[in-house]
């Protein structure tokens, strides 16, 4: 069963369920003479979970890096659908920050969090693509900037509740167990309010109990 918080607040997609959300066609990625991806193509439908399965070195992370803009394939197309009006975006030439603003969020195979910051601070960083006030106004923290941060904090608190992170809210991420850190990284991706969520081996290195918890959270999303 989906949680009320995610259905009503965190999911930014307006693509109808069952319609194409992402279309990948004939992708080829090379690093010098090494072919990482060749003739890769599939369609991701809105409201569904899709898995890319393969052995180590098969190119799974490279494919996600292409979708999120960290890599740019030499050929092929990656088309993101962002609305029920037929709006599409070609991602193969876009930088990562522009793809993130289109609603694509991801976690990484190796944890990419700020270990010296608290869980709350790491999750607030996921809201940066939605912040509209200037740095100066944010530093002074008054008027619109204050109201903006309060609104962002409210959404982050929903993510904390969704992922059962209440007990770790003010703890530095670097002091937490590995499984909790993976959960925080999922949370940071969710605070982007993604229309497309990419999870790179979200259960790697976890014990069986942590895997069960993560599977439950992903299904809730």
Question: Which residues make up each language-model segment?
Answer:
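Glycine-rich phosphate-binding loops of nucleotide-dependent enzymes
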Residues: 2-221
